[in-house]
Amino acid sequence: MADAEDIQPLVCDNGTGMVKAGFAGDDARAVFPSIVGRPRHTGVMVGMGQKDAYVGDEAQSKRGILTLKYPIEHGIVSNWDDMEKIWHHTFYNELRVAPEEHPVLLTEAPLNPKANREKMTQIMFETFNVPAMYVAIQAVLSLYASGRTTGIVLESGDGVSHTVPIYEGYALPHAILRLDLAGRDLTESLMKILTERGYMFTTSAEREIVRDIKEKLAYVALDYEQELETAKSSSSIEKNYELPDGQVITIGAERFRCPEVLFQPSMIGMEAAGIHETTYNSIMKCDVDIRKDLYGNIVLSGGTTMFPGIADRMSKEITALAPSSMKIKVVAPPERRYSVWIGGSILASLSTFQQMWISKAEYDERGPSIVHRKCF
């Protein structure tokens, strides 16, 4: 890795819902759905050169004839063959690079099982022949992207949410909490709400429409009960949405009922604590001396934290739980949808980081377990 200066590292953030990839120092140039689609019916169209699998946007656009699968569930890779297809697509089709020429920085969910980190490492070196790689925890990268090294990150993506307290750049594993409630559950719950109103959304293709409704129209109420009253008495919060077939639907209270689930998981029958309480519980698992630093640096990250109103509501709820004199600051960076990727891009560009990479030589000598020694 002597001539590492002129070789741009690749940064690939594999989320449950979206892959974000690109070159360190740039913006994420490839953002596409983490899906692999396979034809439901084999070879209906002779001579069409039908592929046995489609990845990302192509799978998305042909979703009508495919069965769609997400290889990452709740933030953790569950199907390695499909995951390999996604990485192959990322390098060769999206970024159009030869992976054997670039160091690769991958991201992982907090508390990712050890065997999974080893498998990622193995695939990178043995299948893609990368010269060097590194695995970084997603929340830590988000915190770097916000210009901090200490704070607590509430990460909520499509498949999973975590609260991750970080002190001087190191995640504190004993205080990390996982909540299996995230964007996909909110989409599902909105599908149910709309179905109760007589709009049928059932297939995986229709789920994507509902996801779009959620992303465009949903918001978090500062006071849920009061917002419900407002919704009953006036039509001020109603908005129209045009479906692909031209039908127009009106959504009102659903706009804030949908993300309210983050604060009240019992609304969809989950026994878990809401994101505000989980954040508080995470802080309380930390040493009393660092809590003040955590309360003052609560950083939101991931697509499911993009709802308007979420930061104010978080601030209100945590203020109610915390000691009364505590200064509470919730930070919602505008680019938080991509902050994991941005943090990876920053990290991989640092001159001080260059000795952190796991090289091919080290891998050949030690095997996949090297990842636990070098990435923590």
From Swiss-Prot:
It holds the Pfam family Actin. Keywords: ATP-binding, Cytoplasm, Cytoskeleton, Hydrolase, Nucleotide-binding. It is an enzyme of class 3 (hydrolase). It is found in: Cytoplasm, Cytoskeleton. Its EC number is 3.6.4.-. SMART domains: ACTIN. The keyword DNA-binding does not apply. The keyword Nucleotide-binding applies. One of its GO terms (molecular function) is hydrolase activity. It comes from the Eukaryota. GO terms for cellular component: cytoplasm; cytoskeleton. Coiled coil: none annotated. It catalyses: ATP + H2O = ADP + phosphate + H(+). InterPro entries: Actin, Actin/actin-like_CS, Actin_CS, ATPase_NBD. Belongs to the actin family. Actins are highly conserved proteins that are involved in various types of cell motility and are ubiquitously expressed in all eukaryotic cells. This is Actin-2. It comes from Pisum sativum. The lineage of its organism: Eukaryota, Viridiplantae, Streptophyta, Embryophyta, Tracheophyta.
